[in-house]
C-alpha cells in the first residue's frame, strides 16, 4: 500500500496546483463557460414566457402573443441545443487534455523514481494511480465545473427573474442560503475522506487482480484459487463498503437540502395568500415565481452533489501530487562520457538497504582493471546483486566510494553512466513488441537490420527466430510470454551484445539455458568480453573458472578472493561450494 507525505493540503491549495495544468486550455474553458451560461439563460427565458402567455395570451386574449411566442420558443430551443453541444464538446476536450497531461507527468515521474520506490509499491497500485486517479481528477473536476457554471447560472437567472416580478416573495430564498452553505461545508469533509479511502481500495483491488494474473501458473499448480478468491473478495468488499458510504452520505444530503427548499416553497405559497400581496400579483406572475422555485430544486440538488464530485477529484489530485512531490533519482553529475575505459574501484564501500539496520555490504574493497573479468560467487542473499545495484547506481552507497576511470560514480550523469553498461540478468524483461525491437530496445533507429541479426546469431537466438513465420518481426507478447525462458534469455543476451558497451554485467545470464546452448553462448560471450570490463554473478561455478579474479561474498563481506585454482587449493568457502555443486 502506498505511503506518501501526509501533510494534506486544503482543497483550494490543491486546486491552485492543478490550475497551471488546466490554464493552457483556458480558451476551451471560456467557450464552455459562455455556452453553459447561454444554456441556463435559455431555460430561464423559456420559463419567463409563461407570464405573457397567461396574462396577455389567455388573460387579455392578445393574439399577437401566439404569433411571436412560437418563434421565440424555436429560437430559444435552437440556442439551448447549440450551447449544450458546444459546452459538452469543450469540456470533454479540456478534461481529455488535462487527463493526458496528468498521466504523462505521472508516467514520466514514476519512470524516473529510484529502484527503492518500486520495491515498496505494488504494480497494481501504481497502475491504478496512472489510470483511475488521473481520470478521476479530470472527470470529477470537469463535471463539477459544468454543474457549478450551468446550475449556478440557472439559479442566478431564476432568482433575478423572481426578484424582478416580486422581490417580497423572493426574499424567502435568502433564508435558505445560509442553511444550504452550512450543510455543504459539514458534508464536504466526509466526502473527501471517503474519496481517499475509495482510491486506496481501488489500488488494492487492482493490485490483487494483477498478482493473480501474473502468477496464474503458481495459483493453478499450488491450488491457490481459494486463497486468491478470498483475497479478492475481501478487497472488492472493502471497495463496495466505501462506495456505499459515499451513496449513504449523498442520499442523506440530497433530501435534507430538498426539505429546506420545500419549506421555502411552502412559505411562498402562504405569503402569496396574504391579501396585500395578492393585490400585486397576476396569474402569470405567481405562476412564473412558483414554477421558478420548483425548477430551482434541480440545480440546488445538483449543487449539493457537486461537493462530493469536486472533493472526489481533489482527493485523487492530492494523491497524484503526493507522488509527484517524491524525489526522483539523484542526478547531480556533470561528466558526460562517450565511452569509458572501464576501470572500476570499490573503495571501503558500506551499504544499508532502506529500513534495514544491518549492512548488506560492509567495507567492500576490490578493483577491476579495464578489460578484465571479475566473478562474484556466494550463497543467495550474500550481497552479490547488491554490488551490481550499486555499480549501476540503482542505489547510492552510504559510506566509501566507487570509482570509474578515476572519477566518483556520482560525478557521472546517470544516462551517461548507464550507457556504458550492458546487463543481462536472470529475471529477463521483454516488451510486447517485435523480437528486433526488443533486441534494439530504446535504440531501434540507431542499429541496422544486419547488426541486429548478427547479435541474435551470436546469442544463438536465430535458431528459433528463423523458424518463426515473421522472423525478427514476430510479436512476442507481454514480457515475451510466447517464448520459453531460454529463448527469452537469448534475446536479452543479444540485446547486450548489440549495445557494445565497455562494461558488461551478467547476473546468472545463462541460468535458463540447456548445457549445449550454454556452451555455445559462452564462446560468444568470451569473444564479447575481450577488451571489456566484465562483472559476472554465477551460481554455476564452472562458468567462472576462467575469471581473472573470483570474489566470494558471504553476509556482505568479501571472505575470499583469487583465481579458481588458488581458491580450490585453500579449501575454503569456494572449495566447499565447488565440491558441493559437482558432487551433486
UniProtKB/Swiss-Prot annotation:
Compartments (UniProt record): Cell inner membrane
Summary of subunit composition and partner proteins: Homodimer.
EC number: 7.5.2.6
Keywords carried by this UniProt record: ATP-binding, Cell inner membrane, Cell membrane, Lipid transport, Membrane, Nucleotide-binding, Translocase, Transmembrane, Transmembrane helix, Transport
Function: Involved in lipopolysaccharide (LPS) biosynthesis. Translocates lipid A-core from the inner to the outer leaflet of the inner membrane. Transmembrane domains (TMD) form a pore in the inner membrane and the ATP-binding domain (NBD) is responsible for energy generation.
Top-level EC class: translocase
Record flagged with keyword Transcription: no
Transmembrane regions listed in the UniProt entry: 18-38, 65-85, 155-175, 252-272, 277-297
Record InterPro entries: AAA+_ATPase, ABC1_TM_dom, ABC1_TM_sf, ABC_transporter-like_ATP-bd, ABC_transporter-like_CS, ABC_transpr_lipidA, P-loop_NTPase, Type_1_exporter
Domain ABC transporter: 344-580
Protein name: ATP-dependent lipid A-core flippase
Reactions that this protein is recorded to catalyse: ATP + H2O + lipid A-core oligosaccharideSide 1 = ADP + phosphate + lipid A-core oligosaccharideSide 2
Mode of membrane association: Multi-pass membrane protein
Pfam family, any one: ABC_tran
Top-level taxon: Bacteria
Principal subcellular localization: membrane
Family: Belongs to the ABC transporter superfamily. Lipid exporter (TC 3.A.1.106) family.
A single GO cellular-component term on record: plasma membrane
Residues that hold ATP according to the record: 378-385
Limits of the ABC transmembrane type-1 domain: 30-312
Free-text note on domains in this protein's UniProt record: In MsbA the ATP-binding domain (NBD) and the transmembrane domain (TMD) are fused.
Record-level Gene Ontology MF annotations: ABC-type oligopeptide transporter activity; ATP binding; ATP hydrolysis activity; ATPase-coupled lipid transmembrane transporter activity
Organism of derivation: Blochmanniella pennsylvanica (strain BPEN)
Amino acid at each position: 500500500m502506498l505511503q506518501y507525505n501526509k501533510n494534506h493540503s486544503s482543497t483550494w491549495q490543491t486546486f491552485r496546483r492543478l490550475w497551471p495544468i488546466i490554464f493552457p486550455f483556458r480558451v476551451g474553458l471560456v467557450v464552455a463557460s459562455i455556452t453553459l451560461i447561454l444554456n441556463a439563460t435559455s431555460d430561464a427565458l423559456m420559463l419567463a414566457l409563461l407570464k405573457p402567455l397567461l396574462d396577455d395570451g389567455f388573460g387579455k386574449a392578445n393574439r399577437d402573443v401566439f404569433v411571436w411566442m412560437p418563434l421565440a420558443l424555436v429560437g430559444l430551443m435552437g440556442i439551448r441545443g447549440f450551447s449544450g453541444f458546444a459546452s459538452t464538446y469543450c469540456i470533454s476536450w479540456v478534461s481529455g487534455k488535462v487527463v493526458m497531461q496528468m498521466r504523462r507527468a505521472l508516467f514520466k515521474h514514476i519512470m524516473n523514481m529510484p529502484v527503492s520506490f518500486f520495491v515498496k509499491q505494488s504494480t497494481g497500485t501504481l497502475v491504478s494511480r496512472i489510470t483511475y486517479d488521473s481520470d478521476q481528477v479530470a472527470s470529477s473536476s470537469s463535471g463539477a465545473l459544468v454543474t457549478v457554471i450551468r446550475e449556478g447560472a440557472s439559479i442566478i437567472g431564476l432568482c433575478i427573474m423572481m426578484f424582478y416580478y416580486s422581490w417580497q416573495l423572493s426574499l424567502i430564498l435568502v433564508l435558505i442560503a445560509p442553511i444550504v452553505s452550512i450543510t455543504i461545508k459539514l458534508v464536504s469533509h466526509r466526502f473527501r475522506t471517503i474519496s481517499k479511502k475509495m482510491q486506496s481500495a481501488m489500488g488494492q483491488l487492482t493490485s490483487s487482480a494483477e498478482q493473480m494474473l501474473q502468477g496464474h501458473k503458481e495459483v493453478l499448480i499450488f491450488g491457490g484459487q481459494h486463497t486468491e478468491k478470498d483475497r479478492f473478495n475481501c478487497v472488492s468488499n472493502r471497495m463496495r463498503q466505501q462506495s456505499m458510504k459515499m451513496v449513504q452520505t449523498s442520499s442523506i444530503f440530497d433530501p435534507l437540502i430538498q426539505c429546506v427548499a420545500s419549506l421555502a416553497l411552502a412559505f411562498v405559497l402562504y405569503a402569496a395568500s396574504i391579501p396585500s400581496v395578492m393585490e400585486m400579483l397576476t396569474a402569470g406572475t405567481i405562476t412564473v415565481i412558483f414554477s421558478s422555485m420548483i425548477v430551482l430544486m434541480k440545480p440546488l440538488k445538483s449543487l449539493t452533489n457537486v461537493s462530493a464530485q469536486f472533493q472526489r477529484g481533489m482527493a485523487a489530485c492530492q494523491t497524484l501530487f503526493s507522488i509527484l512531490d517524491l524525489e526522483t533519482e539523484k542526478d547531480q553529475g556533470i561528466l558526460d562520457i562517450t565511452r569509458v575505459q572501464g576501470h572500476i574501484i570499490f573503495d571501503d564501500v558500506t551499504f544499508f538497504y532502506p529500513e534495514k539496520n544491518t549492512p548488506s555490504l560492509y567495507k567492500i574493497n576490490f578493483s577491476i582493471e579495464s578489460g578484465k573479468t571479475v566473478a562474484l560467487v556466494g550463497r543467495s542473499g550474500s550481497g552479490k546483486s547488491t554490488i551490481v545495484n550499486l555499480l549501476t547506481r540503482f542505489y547510492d552507497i552510504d559510506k566509501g566510494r566507487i570509482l570509474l576511470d578515476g572519477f566518483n560514480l556520482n560525478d557521472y550523469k546517470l544516462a551517461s553512466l548507464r550507457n556504458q553498461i550492458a546487463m543481462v540478468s536472470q529475471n529477463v524483461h521483454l516488451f510486447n513488441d517485435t523480437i528486433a525491437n526488443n533486441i534494439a530496445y530504446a535504440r531501434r533507429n540507431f542499429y541496422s537490420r544486419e547488426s541486429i541479426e548478427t547479435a541474435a546469431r551470436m546469442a544463438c537466438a536465430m535458431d528459433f527466430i528463423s523458424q518463426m513465420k515473421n522472423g525478427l518481426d514476430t510479436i512476442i507478447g507481454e514480457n515475451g510470454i510466447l517464448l520459453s525462458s531460454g529463448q527469452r534469455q537469448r534475446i536479452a543476451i543479444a540485446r547486450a551484445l548489440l549495445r557494445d558497451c565497455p562494461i558488461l554485467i551478467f547476473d546468472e545470464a545463462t541460468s535458463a539455458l540447456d548445457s549445449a546452448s550454454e556452451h555455445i553462448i559462452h564462446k560468444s560471450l568470451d569473444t564479447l568480453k575481450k577488451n571489456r570490463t566484465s562483472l559476472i554473478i554465477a551460481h554455476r561455478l564452472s562458468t567462472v573458472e576462467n575469471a581473472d579474479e573470483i570474489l566470494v561474498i558471504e553476509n556482505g563481506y568479501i571472505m575470499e578472493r583469487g583465481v579458481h585454482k588458488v581458491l580450490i587449493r585453500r579449501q575454503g568457502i569456494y572449495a566447499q561450494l565447488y565440491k558441493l555443486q559437482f558432487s551433486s
